[in-house]
Amino acid sequence: MTLDLDAHKKDDKLLITTIQQEYKILAEYKMIESEKLSGIYVIPSYANSLQWFGVFFGRQGLYAESVFRFTILLPDRFPDDKSLPSIIFQQDVIHPHVCPYTHSLDVSHAFPEWRCGEDHLWQLLKYLQVIFSDPLDSIRGIEVDKLKNSEAAELLMNNKEEYVARVQENIKESKEHIFDTPPTEDPHYIVFEKFQQDVHGPVLERIKAGRSKLTEPSAQQANGGHATGLSWVKEGEFKPLSIE
């Protein structure tokens, strides 16, 4: 009987810990929504809140017009763990802070360790935005051999023409795969459809007219309360139909 009681207490404690963690992760997502980071879209996986799907749209600088998909992996004890969240791109991305082998983004220069209550995921995404807007400025004061991709850093500093050419290859590749079949059946995976006038035209017209709220049920309501991750891209362009 005592053993059963102890087991129940452990189960209850684990359940409470899990619920508390879920609320903290939800709070992180709400903060990201409130920050309205331009060109970055993320959503937690439906199946696992420690895994997030994201897309980065380059709006300026060398990476303008890029559409890079990435995954965020949170530590098991996030946000209490001092371990850093991981950002992993789904394709080759040449950048001094991106490992050419694992495609992971090194965030340790901005976040030596994760400080619960002080560091937040929106700051991590803002860092991603900043280092792609100005990659050269992002490596100032850092020794080249301390960077994840020292070859990219050398090119950026000494052969910018070649660096730009390789960035353009990455951008071209990202656009070629934007409409690929999702690698997962997770309903929160961010999906893009080619522009269809009969389906997406009315939405575009409302946006052009400056209407911030649509009268039709949202994608989330139409799916029984679950977000589908669906988005739309105008044909010939790679910008989501949003008010931004």
Swiss-Prot record:
Database matches in Pfam families: UQ_con
Cited PROSITE patterns: UBC_2
Q: Keywords of this protein's UniProt record, alphabetized?
A: Chromosome, DNA replication, Nucleus
Q: Which GO cellular component terms, listed alphabetically, does the Swiss-Prot or TrEMBL entry include?
A: chromosome; nucleolus
Localization, UniProt? Nucleus, Nucleolus; Chromosome
Loss of function: phenotype: Embryonic lethal. Hypomorphic mutants are late larval/pupal lethal and display frequent telomeric fusions in larval mitotic brain cells. Unlike other telomeric fusion mutants these fusion events preferentially occur between heterochromatin-associated telomeres.
Q: Answer whether the UniProt record assigns the keyword Lipid metabolism to this protein.
A: no
Report if keyword Translocase is assigned.
Answer: no
Q: What else is known?
A: Multiple telomeric fusions result in multicentric linear chromosomes that resemble little trains of chromosomes, hence the name 'pendolino', the name of an Italian train.
Subunit relationships: Interacts (via N-terminus) with cav/HOAP (via N-terminus); the interaction is direct. Probably interacts (via N-terminus and UBC domain) with ver and moi.
The name on file for this protein is: Protein pendolino
Gene symbol here is: peo
